[in-house]
């Protein structure tokens, strides 16, 4: 592995071979209309992962790209796809798979924004929406399809999503996708794709078993990985609050509300039931909160996301369905009401605050039973999680 120091970004990158570092978007030799879209999107210079991963993807190599939450991973593969697409061919040429519907829609938004001057078509193919509408859109020809595995496989099986011209498969948040839940569907989809399809795997965390699985459908991939010790985001202050028992968490949360001048905050619980319970209890105590989880119908989830994005709702209580990749600029505080069930999800959750290097605060509610889990997370990421100080309001 060739180590490349990023300088200002204070990250040590590793790659499996020498990777060209492109300091500017011009250095990537992109199509003129794509470059216009990038600048219109207010990107000035490529982020560290974009500087390294876009060129090998454009050259047709299989790539495993790992970077922190909030470093511009979505734009990395969106730019690469848009550069590779033949805009005169009204057939699906790139397929992006995501673990959640919200992430699939967000990717569609980014692709359409960056491809604004290219007359590119991109469809979000997700569960919870009209199958008839999907079929109509796909029949018309969509150059990029961004979707969730279940609905995408359904559309391929029905022959509404034609795969013969697909040349690129992107697996976003691949650790979650390749975990038990989606693994079989990914393999089913992969079998329908042309043999020469280029595969790009993108994620903040790549546990060993995921890397093993990628060997099954990637050929000599270029690996661009951040060293694990660097993975807890710089600029995010992490604290814990010791709560002797579960019942005390609610009072602690209410106390925090009074002391924190919040721009926007996300509160994570481990189950849908807990989200509903906490939302109800907060409202009874006259706090304004909104909530979202995977059991809600798609229309409701969209409306809640739009409200939160627009700033009408300031506090969102949710499950891990929200933790991966959802980009809301104003979030400065994350509270883990429940500690996450996996170390990887801890990173995805706290990566929500302070995107693109802006400051943020993460507060973990820790019962006696949770101490071991917290110490494990701390050790795994070589980070420090201190007891929350009294002046926490000044830190956000």
Swiss-Prot record:
Enzyme Commission number, as recorded: 3.6.4.13
Biological process annotations from GO: mRNA splicing, via spliceosome; rRNA processing
GO cellular component: catalytic step 2 spliceosome; nucleolus
Molecular function GO terms recorded: ATP binding; ATP hydrolysis activity; mRNA binding; RNA helicase activity
Binding site for ATP: 67-74
Keywords: ATP-binding, Helicase, Hydrolase, Nucleotide-binding, Nucleus, Ribosome biogenesis, RNA-binding, rRNA processing
Domain Helicase ATP-binding: 54-224
Motif (DEAD box): 172-175
Main localization (coarse): nucleus
Function summary: ATP-dependent RNA helicase involved in 40S ribosomal subunit biogenesis. Required for the processing and cleavage of 35S pre-rRNA at sites A0, A1, and A2, leading to mature 18S rRNA.
Similarity comment text for this entry: Belongs to the DEAD box helicase family. DDX48/FAL1 subfamily.
Protein name (database record): ATP-dependent RNA helicase FAL1
Gene source species: Cryptococcus neoformans var. neoformans serotype D (strain JEC21 / ATCC MYA-565)
């Amino acid at each position: 592995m060739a180590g490349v120091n990023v300088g200002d970004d204070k990250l040590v990158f590793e790659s499996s071979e020498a990777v060209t570092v492109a300091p500017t978007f011009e250095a990537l030799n992109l199509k003129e209309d794509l470059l216009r879209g990038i600048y219109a999107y207010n990107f000035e210079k490529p982020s560290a992962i974009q500087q390294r991963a876009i060129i090998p993807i454009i050259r047709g190599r299989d790539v495993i790209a790992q970077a922190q939450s909030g470093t511009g991973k979505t734009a990395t593969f969106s730019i690469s796809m848009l550069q590779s697409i033949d805009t005169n061919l009204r057939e699906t040429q790139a397929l992006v798979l995501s673990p959640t519907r919200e992430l699939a829609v967000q990717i569609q938004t980014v692709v359409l924004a960056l491809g604004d001057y290219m007359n590119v078509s991109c469809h979000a193919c997700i569960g919870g929406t009209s199958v008839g509408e999907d079929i109509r859109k796909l029949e018309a020809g969509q150059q990029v399809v961004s979707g969730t595995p279940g609905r995408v496989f359904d559309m391929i099986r029905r022959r509404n999503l034609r795969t013969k011209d697909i040349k690129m498969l992107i697996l976003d948040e691949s650790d979650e996708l390749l975990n038990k839940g989606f693994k079989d569907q990914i393999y089913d989809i992969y079998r329908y794709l042309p043999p020469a399809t280029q595969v790009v795997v993108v994620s903040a965390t790549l546990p060993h078993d995921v890397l093993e699985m990628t060997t099954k459908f990637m050929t000599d991939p270029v690996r661009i990985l951040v060293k694990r010790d660097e993975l807890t985001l710089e600029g995010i202050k992490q604290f814990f609050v010791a709560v002797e028992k579960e019942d005390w968490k609610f009072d602690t949360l209410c106390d925090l509300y009074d002391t924190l001048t919040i721009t926007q905050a996300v509160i994570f619980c481990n189950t849908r039931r807990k989200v509903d319970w906490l939302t109800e209890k907060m409202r009874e105590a006259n706090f304004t909160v909104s909530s979202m989880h995977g059991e809600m119908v798609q229309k409701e989830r969209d409306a809640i996301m739009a409200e939160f994005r627009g700033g009408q709702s300031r506090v969102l209580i949710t499950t891990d369905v929200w933790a991966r990749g959802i980009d809301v600029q104003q979030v400065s505080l994350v509270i883990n009401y429940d500690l996450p069930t996996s170390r990887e999800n801890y990173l995805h959750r706290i990566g929500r605050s302070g995107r693109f290097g802006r400051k943020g605060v993460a507060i973990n509610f820790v019962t006696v039973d949770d101490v071991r889990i917290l110490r494990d997370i701390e050790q795994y990421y070589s980070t420090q999680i201190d007891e929350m100080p009294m002046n926490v309001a000044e830190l956000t």
